[in-house]
Amino acid sequence: MKISIMKHTMIWVAAMMLAMTSAVNAQVNEKANEGQFVRCIAFYNLENLFDTIHDEGKNDYEYLPDGGMKWTSLKYENKVKNMAYAVSQLGTDYDPRGAACIGVAEVENIGCLYDLCAEANSKYGRRLKPILLEGPDRRGVDVGFLYDSIMFKPSKVNGFELKAHYADGGEIKTRLQLCVSGYLMGDGRPEKIHVIVNHWPSRYGGELSSRPGRDTAAMLVKSICDSIYLKEPKAKIVIMGDLNDDPYNHSCKDVLKARKHREEVEPQGYFNTMWQMLDRGIGSLAYNGSWNLFDQIIINEPLLSEKLESGKWTYWKAQIFNKPFLTVQEGKDKGTPFRTTKAGVWQNGYGDHYPTMIYLIRKK
């Protein structure tokens, strides 16, 4: 197996180090405990956020007005409205302003994210801005990144293309891995973090036969992190995405070496914030009557400090955002994610995955 990486780079030259404005210092209930600031970082698979226009060279025909999904402007507008509401609610359990950063998957293009942000900002008072780099996926779906323009200041964006070659001659050319570096703000003192957004190869053809693609994706993530460590040995890194594997699967446990318990994590190692929730039977998507937790958030050792300090973010807790409005309330699918479509039938729901999130805290 070989890995081929193509790197796409965009750089913002911005005033990241400016003090927070008075609006940011508004008195809001953003504390984990008295004297602590909290920030939410989330991931959400948006389940086929396609517009109604054909993208040249992409197999998006199913999501056109005359395609299999009969994807009309009305359906698209309802999808955007639903997802904007869901996105606007992420993190509000601990900060009414919502999440600082949100990685997303299954988005057709940057235009869809602009529509999503515009809806969330105008209707729900959010301050979201989007980032997306076009990748080579055949259907045209990409990963992206939304950020609150006050709570997070992006400084650099890299996209890494994955090509996995197999012994039988097969090849996967799929979604970019998107690395967004920037400054997570809090009381005027920013701290740099790196967020890597993923959507790993699917299990099409079976979990075992498709495993090499996800193992290769895990190796690519590890190489991205290693390159960050070369310049920043104490860098703080958040790995997130729809990995199409559970925390105990080979790609996560053995290739990336993301651990179940924080005390097992070595210097520059990784902690899987979702593993123990799956052990308790809590998942992010349901399949054939059982739960999986493919929507994972993995953090590195520098984020695991148990000492709270001013100006330094550290991990507090993880959450699966399985709120009632995102959940089927009756019938045989009761208790599972409320989807946009099922078996080709329009349901006007949200998506087949629950969002996942972590909270970082620091001393005020």
What residues fall within each predicted segment?
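Extracytoplasmic, non-cytosolic globular domains
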Residues: 132, 178-184, 189-277
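Short, solvent-exposed loop/turn elements at domain surfaces
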Residues: 48-55, 204-205, 306-308
